[in-house]
């Protein structure tokens, strides 16, 4: 086991605070509408420009191990906030730095660290209640657009695009962000259920120009197993011909005689038909097939439930308004399933999302939920250079998370004002059990001003003057609009934050800050003195002695 170095008390805390300050000072230059960019060096490729706090925090690794411990603990604040709320990472870092800085001073002055921590926790609980009191639900898509624009660094185009995407796919819908090939940032919306399986044979194509299959008012046969024998589906084919409706077959596979017969019937024009493989794999495939059955009002032909393919009747087939199949994917539009059944299925998937501990499973369940409940929207982010595209994609991701958070828990006035208003409502009469706890409450009281101070100073204003002006005016929504330099009603001018983001930034900051204030010893591995690499001898070059005559 390697030898360790141990630091105690004030010496340990000073090193830790140093690391906190280095990381927080690099992150906080990005805060607010007039925050600056940070350039991140990469071991390969071009440097990356970002205004995303968590991206900056993740890049910082300090040489001194004790300072690095402090930096990494604050990095944890921003990455935890990013994981839960998706935005507010810079605010969380600024709050953590302020609480740690004031807390360390109090410990150095002889306060009891445990009482300080209790005071901090009391204050944070009270402020969270205060935030709930001033938050309100998102009223319309304009407010969604405003939240998105603020998070994307006052980029109105991004805010509008996210609001439009949410409008089209619903609040449960999946919105993904991808890098585009061109200059334009675009929004593609897939309404209905789409899965990534295309037609089994190009002979099924009905639109030869676009190489796709289009079916209006089709019947849909859903089969869990492979179909290889024609006799199994003959009865269904005859029923489809008699009803003069196209037939869509979704099965594990269709092969041999069955596939050949379907193709021949399609080419002769007697039967409009198309076959695709079932989406997904293993257990997930069965679940997705059941989703499709619920959406279309059909029955999944599965031996598990005692339904054999030979015994399928026409009323077991699903229906939809239309289906479009390309080489790569299939889209079912406006399935004819019962709304109550779809709702029950959606609630069942929601319950599974709550229960699962795997991020991968959660993501796949979210996709299934979106396909049933709304649709899928893709924002393709464009730009002139790769560096610009990556920077813009960071901002769009932030904006997307922020708008989701706003829909979940409502909105509060932005620009660092919500924390001050919640402070007025909840900390004015809050009393700790003793003097040291009261100091902990006062530390939080002071720290809640910090985001507004930094936003103001990044915009070229004097932080203390701005804070005093905002605190003097008791109107909840009144604050400093750093983008325009005007004091005004922030909600009316569209400067709003999701309550969830502000709440989580404060809770994560206080959680880590409380732990760091109560630290009394730090242990790190001693750096190893690696001997220098021995120089190689000039073996084999001895014969070059005669080169002396070249002088």
UniProtKB/Swiss-Prot annotation:
Keywords: ATP-binding, Chaperone, Cytoplasm, Isomerase, Nucleotide-binding. Together with its co-chaperonin GroES, plays an essential role in assisting protein folding. The GroEL-GroES system forms a nano-cage that allows encapsulation of the non-native substrate proteins and provides a physical environment optimized to promote and accelerate protein folding. It comes from Magnetococcus marinus (strain ATCC BAA-1437 / JCM 17883 / MC-1). This is Chaperonin GroEL. One of its GO terms (molecular function) is ATP binding. The keyword Chaperone applies. Forms a cylinder of 14 subunits composed of two heptameric rings stacked back-to-back. Interacts with the co-chaperonin GroES. It comes from the Bacteria.
């Amino acid at each position: 086991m390697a030898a360790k170095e141990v630091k105690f008390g004030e010496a340990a805390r000073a090193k830790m605070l140093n690391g906190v300050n280095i990381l927080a000072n690099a992150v906080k230059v990005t805060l607010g509408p007039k925050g600056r960019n940070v350039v991140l060096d990469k071991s390969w490729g071009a440097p990356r420009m970002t205004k995303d706090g968590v991206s900056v925090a993740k890049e910082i690794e300090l040489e001194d191990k004790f300072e690095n411990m402090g930096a990494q603990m604050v990095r944890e604040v921003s990455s935890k906030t990013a994981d839960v709320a998706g935005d507010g990472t810079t605010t969380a870092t600024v709050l953590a730095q302020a609480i740690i800085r004031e807390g360390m001073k109090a410990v150095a002055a002889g306060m009891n660290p445990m009482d300080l921590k209790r005071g901090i926790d009391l204050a944070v609980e009270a402020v969270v209640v205060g935030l709930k009191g001033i938050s309100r639900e998102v009223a319309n898509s304009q407010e969604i657009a405003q939240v998105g624009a603020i998070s994307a660094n006052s980029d109105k185009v991004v805010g509008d695009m996210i609001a439009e995407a949410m409008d089209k796919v619903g609040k449960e819908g999946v919105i993904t962000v991808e890098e585009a090939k061109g200059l334009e940032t675009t929004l593609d919306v897939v309404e209905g259920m789409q899965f990534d399986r295309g037609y089994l044979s190009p002979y099924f194509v009905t639109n030869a120009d676009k190489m796709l299959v289009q079916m209006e008012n089709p019947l849909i046969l859903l089969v869990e197993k492979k179909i290889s024998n024609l006799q199994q589906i003959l009865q269904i084919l005859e029923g489809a011909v008699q009803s003069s409706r196209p037939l869509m077959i979704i099965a594990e596979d269709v092969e041999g005689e069955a596939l050949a017969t379907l193709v021949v019937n399609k080419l002769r024009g007697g039967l409009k038909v198309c076959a695709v493989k079932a989406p997904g794999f293993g257990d997930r495939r069965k679940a997705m097939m059941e989703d499709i059955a619920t959406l279309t009002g059909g029955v999944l032909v599965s031996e598990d439930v005692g339904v054999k393919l030979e015994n399928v009747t026409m009323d077991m087939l699903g229906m939809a308004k239309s289906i479009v199949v390309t080489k790569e994917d299939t889209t079912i539009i406006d399935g004819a399933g019962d709304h109550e059944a779809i709702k029950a299925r959606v609630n069942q998937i929601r319950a599974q999302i709550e229960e699962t501990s795997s991020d991968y499973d959660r993501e796949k369940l979210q996709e299934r939920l979106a396909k049933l409940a709304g649709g899928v929207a893709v924002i393709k982010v464009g730009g002139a250079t790769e560096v610009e595209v990556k920077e813009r994609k960071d901002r769009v991701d932030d904006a997307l998370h922020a708008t989701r958070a706003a829909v979940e828990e409502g909105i509060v006035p932005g620009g660092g004002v919500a924390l001050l208003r919640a402070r007025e409502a909840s900390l004015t009469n809050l009393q700790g059990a003793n003097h040291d706890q009261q100091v902990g409450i006062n530390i939080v009281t002071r720290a809640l001003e910090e985001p507004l101070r930094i936003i103001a100073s990044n915009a070229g204003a004097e932080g203390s003057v701005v804070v005093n002006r905002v605190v003097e005016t008791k109107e909840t929504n009144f604050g400093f609009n750093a983008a325009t330099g005007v004091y005004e009603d922030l909600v009316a001018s569209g400067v709003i934050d999701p309550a969830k983001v502000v709440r989580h930034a404060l809770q994560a900051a206080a959680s880590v800050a409380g732990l760091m204030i109560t630290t009394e010893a730090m242990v790190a591995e001693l750096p190893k003195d690696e001997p220098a690499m021995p120089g190689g001898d000039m073996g084999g070059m001895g014969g070059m002695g005669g080169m002396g005559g070249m002088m």
